[in-house]
Protein backbone atom coordinates (compact mmCIF):
# COMPACT_ATOMS: atom_id res chain seq x y z
CA UNK A 1 0.00 0.00 0.00
CA UNK A 2 1.53 3.26 -1.18
CA UNK A 3 1.62 5.89 1.54
CA UNK A 4 1.24 9.54 0.61
CA UNK A 5 4.55 11.16 -0.15
CA UNK A 6 5.90 14.09 -2.19
CA UNK A 7 6.26 13.61 -5.94
CA UNK A 8 9.37 15.57 -6.81
CA UNK A 9 11.33 16.75 -9.86
CA UNK A 10 15.04 17.50 -10.11
CA UNK A 11 16.19 21.10 -9.70
CA UNK A 12 19.20 20.31 -11.87
CA UNK A 13 20.35 17.46 -14.12
CA UNK A 14 23.96 16.89 -15.17
CA UNK A 15 25.35 14.39 -17.65
CA UNK A 16 28.04 12.12 -16.26
CA UNK A 17 31.58 12.72 -17.54
CA UNK A 18 32.84 10.39 -20.28
CA UNK A 19 35.25 7.53 -19.86
CA UNK A 20 36.26 5.62 -23.03
CA UNK A 21 33.27 6.52 -25.18
CA UNK A 22 32.19 10.04 -26.11
CA UNK A 23 28.88 11.53 -24.99
CA UNK A 24 27.55 8.57 -23.03
CA UNK A 25 29.15 8.91 -19.58
CA UNK A 26 29.37 5.50 -17.92
CA UNK A 27 27.04 2.93 -16.34
CA UNK A 28 26.85 4.37 -12.84
CA UNK A 29 25.86 2.32 -9.79
CA UNK A 30 26.91 3.18 -6.23
CA UNK A 31 27.48 6.77 -5.10
CA UNK A 32 29.56 7.97 -2.14
CA UNK A 33 30.59 11.52 -1.21
CA UNK A 34 34.07 11.74 0.29
CA UNK A 35 33.83 14.82 2.45
CA UNK A 36 37.53 14.86 3.37
CA UNK A 37 38.73 14.78 -0.24
CA UNK A 38 35.66 16.58 -1.63
CA UNK A 39 34.86 14.28 -4.51
CA UNK A 40 32.42 11.54 -5.40
CA UNK A 41 33.23 7.85 -5.63
CA UNK A 42 30.95 6.26 -8.23
CA UNK A 43 30.63 2.58 -9.09
CA UNK A 44 31.00 1.88 -12.80
CA UNK A 45 29.42 -1.46 -13.71
CA UNK A 46 31.86 -1.74 -16.59
CA UNK A 47 29.47 -2.37 -19.48
CA UNK A 48 27.83 0.29 -21.65
CA UNK A 49 25.02 -2.03 -22.76
CA UNK A 50 23.71 -5.32 -21.34
CA UNK A 51 24.96 -7.39 -24.29
CA UNK A 52 28.57 -6.14 -24.14
CA UNK A 53 30.79 -9.19 -23.70
CA UNK A 54 32.63 -8.58 -20.44
CA UNK A 55 32.36 -6.42 -17.36
CA UNK A 56 35.20 -4.01 -16.62
CA UNK A 57 33.99 -2.84 -13.22
CA UNK A 58 35.75 0.12 -11.66
CA UNK A 59 35.30 2.98 -9.23
CA UNK A 60 35.36 6.42 -10.83
CA UNK A 61 36.57 9.37 -8.75
CA UNK A 62 34.55 12.34 -9.96
CA UNK A 63 34.73 16.09 -9.35
CA UNK A 64 32.07 17.66 -7.12
CA UNK A 65 30.42 19.34 -10.13
CA UNK A 66 30.51 16.07 -12.11
CA UNK A 67 32.63 17.77 -14.79
CA UNK A 68 35.49 15.27 -15.03
CA UNK A 69 36.73 11.91 -13.84
CA UNK A 70 39.79 12.69 -11.68
CA UNK A 71 40.93 9.09 -11.39
CA UNK A 72 39.74 5.53 -11.22
CA UNK A 73 40.27 2.23 -9.45
CA UNK A 74 40.03 -0.60 -12.02
CA UNK A 75 38.65 -3.37 -9.80
CA UNK A 76 38.27 -5.82 -12.69
CA UNK A 77 42.06 -5.97 -13.13
CA UNK A 78 42.52 -7.17 -9.53
CA UNK A 79 39.55 -9.54 -9.25
CA UNK A 80 39.18 -11.76 -12.29
CA UNK A 81 35.84 -13.28 -11.21
CA UNK A 82 34.29 -9.91 -10.54
CA UNK A 83 31.35 -8.95 -12.73
CA UNK A 84 29.56 -5.69 -11.93
CA UNK A 85 30.12 -3.35 -9.02
CA UNK A 86 27.24 -1.92 -7.00
CA UNK A 87 27.47 0.13 -3.79
CA UNK A 88 30.69 1.82 -2.63
CA UNK A 89 31.60 3.41 0.69
CA UNK A 90 34.67 4.33 2.73
CA UNK A 91 35.50 3.67 6.35
CA UNK A 92 37.28 6.18 8.61
CA UNK A 93 40.71 4.73 7.79
CA UNK A 94 40.23 5.69 4.12
CA UNK A 95 39.81 2.14 2.86
CA UNK A 96 36.98 1.26 0.50
CA UNK A 97 34.16 -1.27 0.74
CA UNK A 98 32.20 -2.32 -2.33
CA UNK A 99 29.36 -4.63 -3.28
CA UNK A 100 30.40 -7.22 -5.85
CA UNK A 101 26.86 -8.33 -6.64
CA UNK A 102 27.75 -10.93 -9.28
CA UNK A 103 30.15 -12.66 -6.86
CA UNK A 104 27.85 -12.43 -3.80
CA UNK A 105 30.66 -10.68 -1.95
CA UNK A 106 31.44 -7.47 -0.12
CA UNK A 107 35.04 -6.59 -0.97
CA UNK A 108 37.44 -4.44 1.06
CA UNK A 109 40.22 -2.67 -0.87
CA UNK A 110 42.75 0.10 -0.40
CA UNK A 111 42.76 3.29 -2.48
CA UNK A 112 44.88 1.63 -5.17
CA UNK A 113 42.44 -1.25 -5.48
CA UNK A 114 44.53 -3.85 -3.67
CA UNK A 115 42.60 -6.50 -1.78
CA UNK A 116 42.41 -6.20 2.01
CA UNK A 117 39.69 -8.79 2.48
CA UNK A 118 36.12 -9.80 1.67
CA UNK A 119 33.11 -11.60 3.08
CA UNK A 120 30.25 -13.48 1.45
CA UNK A 121 26.74 -12.09 1.39
CA UNK A 122 23.95 -12.94 -1.03
CA UNK A 123 23.11 -10.29 -3.65
CA UNK A 124 24.56 -7.16 -1.98
CA UNK A 125 23.62 -3.91 -3.73
CA UNK A 126 23.75 -0.95 -1.33
CA UNK A 127 26.40 -0.27 1.31
CA UNK A 128 27.08 2.47 3.86
CA UNK A 129 29.71 2.77 6.55
CA UNK A 130 28.53 3.56 10.09
CA UNK A 131 31.30 5.54 11.77
CA UNK A 132 29.41 5.49 15.09
CA UNK A 133 29.98 1.76 15.49
CA UNK A 134 32.55 0.95 12.78
CA UNK A 135 30.09 -1.34 11.04
CA UNK A 136 28.52 -1.61 7.60
CA UNK A 137 24.89 -1.36 6.51
CA UNK A 138 24.23 -3.58 3.50
CA UNK A 139 21.06 -3.81 1.42
CA UNK A 140 20.28 -7.01 -0.50
CA UNK A 141 17.19 -8.11 -2.44
CA UNK A 142 15.36 -9.05 0.77
CA UNK A 143 17.18 -7.64 3.77
CA UNK A 144 18.99 -4.70 5.30
CA UNK A 145 21.90 -6.00 7.37
CA UNK A 146 24.19 -4.33 9.87
CA UNK A 147 27.50 -6.21 9.75
CA UNK A 148 30.84 -5.98 11.48
CA UNK A 149 33.87 -5.40 9.25
CA UNK A 150 34.51 -9.16 9.21
CA UNK A 151 31.00 -9.86 7.95
CA UNK A 152 29.27 -10.94 11.15
CA UNK A 153 25.60 -9.93 10.97
CA UNK A 154 24.59 -7.93 14.05
CA UNK A 155 21.14 -6.85 12.96
CA UNK A 156 18.71 -7.91 10.22
CA UNK A 157 15.74 -5.90 8.96
CA UNK A 158 13.46 -7.61 6.46
CA UNK A 159 12.78 -5.23 3.57
CA UNK A 160 11.39 -6.25 0.23
CA UNK A 161 10.49 -3.39 -2.11
CA UNK A 162 10.62 -3.94 -5.87
CA UNK A 163 13.95 -2.75 -7.23
CA UNK A 164 15.50 -1.80 -3.86
CA UNK A 165 19.09 -0.93 -4.58
CA UNK A 166 21.36 1.71 -3.03
CA UNK A 167 21.81 3.16 0.47
CA UNK A 168 22.64 6.36 2.26
CA UNK A 169 23.05 6.51 6.05
CA UNK A 170 22.10 9.66 7.97
CA UNK A 171 23.94 9.03 11.24
CA UNK A 172 22.67 12.17 12.92
CA UNK A 173 19.00 11.24 12.54
CA UNK A 174 19.52 7.46 12.69
CA UNK A 175 17.91 6.99 9.26
CA UNK A 176 18.77 4.87 6.25
CA UNK A 177 17.65 6.17 2.86
CA UNK A 178 17.40 3.69 0.01
CA UNK A 179 16.55 3.88 -3.67
CA UNK A 180 13.97 1.62 -5.31
CA UNK A 181 12.45 1.22 -8.73
CA UNK A 182 13.01 -0.96 -11.77
CA UNK A 183 10.44 0.29 -14.23
CA UNK A 184 12.73 2.45 -16.47
CA UNK A 185 9.69 4.24 -17.93
CA UNK A 186 7.91 5.15 -14.70
CA UNK A 187 8.45 6.38 -11.17
CA UNK A 188 11.34 5.61 -8.86
CA UNK A 189 11.29 5.97 -5.09
CA UNK A 190 13.32 7.03 -2.10
CA UNK A 191 12.43 5.18 1.09
CA UNK A 192 13.65 5.70 4.62
CA UNK A 193 14.19 3.16 7.37
CA UNK A 194 13.98 4.51 10.90
CA UNK A 195 16.69 2.52 12.66
CA UNK A 196 14.96 2.96 16.02
CA UNK A 197 11.79 1.20 14.84
CA UNK A 198 13.13 -0.68 11.75
CA UNK A 199 10.14 0.61 9.81
CA UNK A 200 10.55 1.39 6.10
CA UNK A 201 8.36 3.99 4.45
CA UNK A 202 8.35 5.88 1.15
CA UNK A 203 9.64 9.45 1.37
CA UNK A 204 9.73 10.72 -2.23
CA UNK A 205 8.43 9.64 -5.60
CA UNK A 206 11.03 10.76 -8.14
CA UNK A 207 9.14 11.68 -11.30
CA UNK A 208 12.20 12.05 -13.54
CA UNK A 209 14.71 9.47 -12.31
CA UNK A 210 13.83 6.56 -14.56
CA UNK A 211 16.91 4.39 -14.05
CA UNK A 212 17.66 5.06 -10.40
CA UNK A 213 20.98 3.93 -8.95
CA UNK A 214 23.19 5.43 -6.22
CA UNK A 215 21.97 8.14 -3.87
CA UNK A 216 23.59 10.45 -1.38
CA UNK A 217 22.65 13.62 0.49
CA UNK A 218 25.17 16.43 0.91
CA UNK A 219 24.13 19.68 2.63
CA UNK A 220 20.39 19.18 2.03
CA UNK A 221 20.93 18.24 -1.60
CA UNK A 222 19.88 14.79 -2.81
CA UNK A 223 22.04 13.37 -5.62
CA UNK A 224 20.50 10.50 -7.60
CA UNK A 225 22.47 8.63 -10.24
CA UNK A 226 20.61 7.29 -13.28
CA UNK A 227 22.09 4.77 -15.73
CA UNK A 228 19.44 5.37 -18.37
CA UNK A 229 21.75 4.68 -21.31
CA UNK A 230 22.38 1.10 -20.16
CA UNK A 231 18.69 0.38 -19.59
CA UNK A 232 17.39 2.36 -22.59
CA UNK A 233 15.13 4.10 -20.09
CA UNK A 234 12.57 6.88 -20.68
CA UNK A 235 15.53 9.29 -20.40
CA UNK A 236 18.26 7.18 -21.99
CA UNK A 237 21.18 9.15 -20.58
CA UNK A 238 23.68 8.36 -17.82
CA UNK A 239 23.16 11.35 -15.55
CA UNK A 240 22.85 12.68 -12.03
CA UNK A 241 19.53 14.21 -10.98
CA UNK A 242 19.94 16.81 -8.25
CA UNK A 243 17.10 17.64 -5.86
CA UNK A 244 17.33 20.61 -3.46
CA UNK A 245 15.51 19.30 -0.41
CA UNK A 246 14.99 22.80 0.98
CA UNK A 247 13.48 23.92 -2.37
CA UNK A 248 11.51 20.86 -3.41
CA UNK A 249 9.98 21.04 -6.88
CA UNK A 250 6.70 19.22 -7.12
CA UNK A 251 6.12 19.97 -10.78
CA UNK A 252 8.36 20.26 -13.79
CA UNK A 253 10.22 23.51 -13.51
CA UNK A 254 13.84 22.95 -14.49
CA UNK A 255 16.44 25.59 -13.85
What residue ranges belong to the model's regions?
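Short loop/turn segments that connect beta-strands within beta-propeller blades
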Residues: 2, 63-67, 109-114, 148-152, ...
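Surface loop/turn motifs at the tips and blade-to-blade linkers of beta-strand repeat domains
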Residues: 14-24, 73-81, 118-122, 157-162, ...
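Repeated scaffold domains used in trafficking and secretory/extracellular systems
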Residues: 23-32, 81-88, 122-131, 161-170, ...
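Conserved beta-propeller blade signature
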Residues: 39-42, 96-98, 135-138, 175-178, ...
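Short loop/turn segments immediately following the C-termini of beta-strands
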Residues: 44-47, 101-102, 141, 181-183, ...
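Structural motif
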Residues: 49-61, 104-108, 143-147, 185-191, ...
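Loop/turn-rich, solvent-exposed surfaces of beta-rich toroidal or solenoidal domains
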Residues: 78-104, 161-192
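Blade-level signature of beta-propeller repeat domains, shared across WD40, Kelch, NHL, RCC1
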Residues: 128, 213-255
Amino acid sequence: EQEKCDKIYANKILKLPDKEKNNVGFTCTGLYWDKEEEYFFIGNAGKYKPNDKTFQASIEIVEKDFSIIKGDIPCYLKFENMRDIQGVTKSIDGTIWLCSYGENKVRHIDEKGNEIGYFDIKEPSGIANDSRSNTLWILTNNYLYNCSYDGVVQKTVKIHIKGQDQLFLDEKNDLIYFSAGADYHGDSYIYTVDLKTNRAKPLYVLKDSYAIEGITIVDDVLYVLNDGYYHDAETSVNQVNIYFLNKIQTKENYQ
